[in-house]
Amino acid sequence: MLKIVGFGSGAKDNMTLEAFAAISDARLIVGYKTYVNILKQYFPEKEYYSTDMMQEKERCQYAIDKAEEGLKVVLVCSGDSGIYGMAGLVYELAQKRVQIKVISGVTAASSGAAILGAPLSHDFAVISLSDCMTPWELIKKRVRAAADSDMVMCIYNPSSRRRAGYLKEACEIVSKIQSQDTICGYVKNIGRDNEKAEILTLKELAECDVDMFTTVYIGNSHTKVIDGRMVTPRGYKVI
């Protein structure tokens, strides 16, 4: 059996019990090199196989091959393995060659939201600004549709060296529909030693320095700051 495991933010306390048990039981851990390096501090006795960014197919195929040989293999992903993770690709590649079990993890949308307060208490859209797999024009269309619907947006992969201006452009799209004073927030390096969180306006967010390890939240027209926390009301009547 091949287990595809989402291990959360990387902090041991952020792993689900099921994810921790699956990794503990495995002989071989396969994953992106940054994630493998995180797990080595918790599971130093395991065998590891890692690849770089843009080598996802190779690492998934390796995990499938080793599971087919009878090894206890886990393919690890940060956050949840079914949300921008490797679960879908493994199903496409495996074609019933091995039994697959997907083990959910805490995705950045959830863990980052908890740090900021409660920004996702109503309908929201999760959108990645990475155009490696999705054309930028289609991503912008989705951002526009979410803003038109007055949904909170949780933005994954907001920036990189090659895509330095993408978040600013996304904010400009939203600002044509929503107020520039819309409450927003971001969390960098969730659950890690250099974690940083900030609540700010849409106008300020457009000029913000973010990276691939940042999760961004753009509020809706009802999102507000309560006691220093970003909160999107669900709609309950509060006396």
Provide a role label for each language-model segment.
Residues 1-103, 111, 206:
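Class I S-adenosyl-L-methionine
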Residues 42, 86-87, 113-114, 137-138, ...:
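Short, well-ordered secondary-structure micro-motifs
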Residues 7-14, 134-136, 198-200:
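Short gly/ser/thr-rich secondary-structure transition/capping motifs
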Residues 7-9, 31-34, 51-53, 78-80, ...:
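Fold-independent oxyanion-binding glycine-rich loops
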Residues 71-77, 119-131, 203-212:
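A polyampholytic, Gly/Pro-enriched intrinsically disordered region
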Residues 85-149:
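Class I SAM-dependent methyltransferase SAM-binding "motif I" and its flanking Rossmann-like core
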Residues 2-4, 72, 148-239:
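A contiguous loop/helix-start segment that scaffolds small-molecule binding in enzyme catalytic cores
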